[in-house]
Amino acid sequence: AELRDYEILRKIGIPLPQLLAVDAPHERILKEYIDGPTVAALIKTGRMEPAWLEQVQAMCALLYPAGWNIDYYPTNFVPQNGTLYYIDYECNPYQPEWDFEHWGVQYWSKTDALLAYAAAHP
């Protein structure tokens, strides 16, 4: 599934780590390592860059018309050299209740929702 999702997201134009190798019989993939803390880790320390939200919204502008959502939880994003990378390859057919505006945005600041999720998933 991740290989299919990678191809979908790559064609849409979502910034992703490069897929380096696939071991289909064992269902393993090797992808480029994007160095740096996740957006979730940075938010917990009080750091939030407006450009990150702008870049997620730009991703949404590509995803929604193509009929897709990604997992907008901030552990899936790493900023590096001015680019916000979506480091998970997962995507799902678009459903408004799971889009960024209705679900993901609640986790993109130091909200009770983010802190509760982080406490439950250390």
Please place each PLM-identified region on the residue numbering:
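ATP-binding glycine-rich loop module of kinase domains
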Residues: 1
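Conserved hydrophobic core/spine positions of the Hanks-type protein kinase catalytic domain
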Residues: 58-62
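Conserved structural core of kinase catalytic domains
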Residues: 16-53
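Polybasic, positively charged surfaces/segments
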Residues: 29-33, 48-55, 66, 80, ...
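Hydrophobic residue at the +6 position relative to the catalytic HRD Asp in the kinase catalytic loop
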Residues: 72-77
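Protein kinase-like catalytic domain
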Residues: 10, 63-64
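Structural motif at the C-terminus of the N-lobe alphaC helix and the adjacent alphaC-beta4 loop
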Residues: 4-15
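C-lobe/activation-segment region of protein kinase-like
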Residues: 64-69, 80-122
